[in-house]
């Protein structure tokens, strides 16, 4: 049986350390040799990664005796051709197959077995990419005599309203395939930007439950990948203080992303704790999550979007100061859309968005505070904490970075007051340390945001 990776090293710009594309080749090898990651994701989604990078990683791995295609894989994330230029998607596929051409020629191994297709909302695009891969592979074999192997498409579903349909989408994507084992990627971050922390967290546990159902009904083994970062808003699976709890809350995953912040902004001991928590809890099970959560996901999303829409100008103002620590396309060119009725607003991508909220003294998990107070008053909050057993600890963690005085300079009194009232209800003391408070009192600038981020151990 083919080895399925457990730890996926990514190129997310969530660290305070600037990493250039030139450094990413060495970074990929270090991910295996120092951090124990058995997969590295070369990212082309909204990112100016050289198309020769997968091949360069292949050649470096061969020279370093890294067990390519056995214990170490390169996985390419291409742009979704519906959202970015079609040529960029095709060039990314070419980069993956060129890497396999060289790994097959020089190491008789297949370095790239999977490509990730982001922002999947239907199965047509997945099938298009799969068809293009197979046709390109046939041409390589017929024209060069080199079998670059079969490359599978991993659908990355990263919108709460689409994740709740994961069972249907996966069923359509793999219904005509002979595979007995498939990988499905669930992303927390972009879903949180669009729908808020509560809705996106509930959508993921519901999707995991439905994928388990699909597995039982189809006989196809599903290997879920969880895409999560360090802050609670982005899943906290990489957070040294929360990872051991999050692995229980999101039980059922097989692979987890190891993003940049946990590798560069924490100590090696802290990283090892995160890694061991993820590995030890892999493949655990949790009770089935029923359809009763769907109305709550809808309500939480609507309430969150209503609050976020009121503050779009301030978010954009602060987001412009958040530094880019990878060679990504600016969020102004490739951001995220937030829908509220007929209104569409252009938002930063998840890491910049999250960082901006922290810089305003208001962690983005607290945007749900008005709804949580409503749930508390109607005796429904305990049911939420039962579904998400780590949720209260996430809120307690984020209240360490909440400063009402700073937040009032940017946000409505209504939202800030709701966060204060929620802290009182939960019995949580909302008090940042004197050092963090002093940083919040300073004028916002790029160095100031970096300093705040270094204290938290993540940019966003």
Swiss-Prot record:
Signal peptide positions on this chain: none
EC category: lyase
Source organism of this protein record: Pyrobaculum arsenaticum (strain DSM 13514 / JCM 11321 / PZ6)
Superkingdom classification of source: Archaea
InterPro entries named among the record's database cross-references: PEP_COase_arc-type (IPR007566), Pyrv/PenolPyrv_kinase-like_dom (IPR015813)
Catalytic activity annotation: oxaloacetate + phosphate = phosphoenolpyruvate + hydrogencarbonate
UniProt entry tagged with the keyword Magnesium: yes
A GO MF label: phosphoenolpyruvate carboxylase activity
HAMAP family referenced in this protein's UniProt entry, alphabetically: PEPcase_type2 (MF_01904)
Keyword entries, A-Z: Carbon dioxide fixation, Lyase, Magnesium
Function: Catalyzes the irreversible beta-carboxylation of phosphoenolpyruvate (PEP) to form oxaloacetate (OAA), a four-carbon dicarboxylic acid source for the tricarboxylic acid cycle.
Descriptive protein name: Phosphoenolpyruvate carboxylase
């Amino acid at each position: 049986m083919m080895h399925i990776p457990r730890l996926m090293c990514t190129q997310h710009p969530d660290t305070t350390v600037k990493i250039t594309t030139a450094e990413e080749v060495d970074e990929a090898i270090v991910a295996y040799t120092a951090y124990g990651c058995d997969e590295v994701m070369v990212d082309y989604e909204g990112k100016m990664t050289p198309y020769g990078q997968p091949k360069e990683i292949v050649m470096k791995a061969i020279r370093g005796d890294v067990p390519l295609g056995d214990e170490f894989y390169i996985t390419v994330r291409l742009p979704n051709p519906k959202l970015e230029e079609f040529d960029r998607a095709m060039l990314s596929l070419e980069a993956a197959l060129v890497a396999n051409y060289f790994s097959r020629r020089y190491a008789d191994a297949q370095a790239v077995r999977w490509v990730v297709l982001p922002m999947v909302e239907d199965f047509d695009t997945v099938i298009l990419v799969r068809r293009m891969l197979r046709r390109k592979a046939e041409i390589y074999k017929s024209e060069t005599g080199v079998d670059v192997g079969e490359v599978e498409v991993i659908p990355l579903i990263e919108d709460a309203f689409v994740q709740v349909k994961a069972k249907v989408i996966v069923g359509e994507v793999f219904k005509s395939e002979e595979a007995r084992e498939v990988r499905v990627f669930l992303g927390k971050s972009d879903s949180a930007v669009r729908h808020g922390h509560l809705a996106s967290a509930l959508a993921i546990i519901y999707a995991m439950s439905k994928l388990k159902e699909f597995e039982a009904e189809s006989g196809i083994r599903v290997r879920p990948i969880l895409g999560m970062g360090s802050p609670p808003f982005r899943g906290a699976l990489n957070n040294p203080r929360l990872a051991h709890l999050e692995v229980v809350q999101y039980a059922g995953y097989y692979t987890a992303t190891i993003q940049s912040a946990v590798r560069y902004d924490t100590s090696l001991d802290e990283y090892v704790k995160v890694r061991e928590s993820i590995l030890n809890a892999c493949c655990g099970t949790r009770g089935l999550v029923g359809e009763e959560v769907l109305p709550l996901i809808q309500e939480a999303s609507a309430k969150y979007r209503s609050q976020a829409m009121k503050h779009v100008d301030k978010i954009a103002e602060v987001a412009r100061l958040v530094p880019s620590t990878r060679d990504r396309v600016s969020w102004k060119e490739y951001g995220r859309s937030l829908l509220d009725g007929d209104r569409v607003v252009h938002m930063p991508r998840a890491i910049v968005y999250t960082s901006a909220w922290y810089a305003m003294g208001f962690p983005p998990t607290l945007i749900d505070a008005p709804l949580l107070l409503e749930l508390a008053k109607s005796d429904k909050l305990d049911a939420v904490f039962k579904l998400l057993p780590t949720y209260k600890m996430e809120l307690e963690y984020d209240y360490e970075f909440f400063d009402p005085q700073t937040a009032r300079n940017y946000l409505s009194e209504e939202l800030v007051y709701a966060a204060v009232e929620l802290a009182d209800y939960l019995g949580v003391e909302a008090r940042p340390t004197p050092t963090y408070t002093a940083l919040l009192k300073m004028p916002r600038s790029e160095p100031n945001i970096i300093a705040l981020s270094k204290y938290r151990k993540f940019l966003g």
